[in-house]
Amino acid sequence: MKIINFTIPEKIGKSIHIKEDKLPYFYPHLHRHVEIQITWVLSGEGTIVIGNNMKPFQPGDLFVIGANQPHLFKSNPCYFEPDSRKKIHALNIFFNPEGFISQLLRFPEMYNIKKFIKSSNYGIQASEKDAPKLFEHFLKVINNEEGFMMAYFIEMLQTMANLTEWKYFSTESFEYLFTDIEGLKMNDILRYTMDHYKEEI
């Protein structure tokens, strides 16, 4: 098993991609993609793996996952039971930092946003205090079209860049691509850890 290179479906004429997940459980494989991912968990519990760290997630959490950063939302075991009626619900915004926004980042006024995008390589989570502020911006982005969507998207990034209480996941920035061998090793470690996390080491 290796890290799956996931391709986010692109819509012609769209610079950012909005995706709503309503499923029995989250996508159960460690994967990565070239887009930065902003995820708002509306319902569902489990363990999130970003880079070289993991922690529980719950409804109300908001994460920013860097481009090409291996990650996994692992739903709790009860979601996989045959008679389970549990569902997950999440809203996602994807954008390629090497795409349209790379042109905008050349402007000096975009310095803080550029710095924030760089920090996403560590995998970050909004604090409980700041998350509600971001939800309002999130909804503006996904509920608008064309120019208004882009304006609200930049506004959201600026708001994120101004926050100071982000929780960092990784101790190292994941700016490089893993080889298949490295991905295999990481999957083995994660699989063992998550299968035996209740046991004493």
Stretch-by-stretch model annotation:
Residues 35, 115, 138-145, 188:
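Juxtamembrane/interfacial segments around transmembrane helices
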Residues 51, 96, 194:
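Residue-level recognition of the GNAT/N-acetyltransferase active site
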Residues 56-74, 153-160:
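Conserved long hydrophobic alpha-helices within structured protein cores
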Residues 1-63:
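Generic protein-terminus/edge-of-domain signal
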Residues 14, 109, 130-137, 149-152, ...:
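Alpha-helical structural motif
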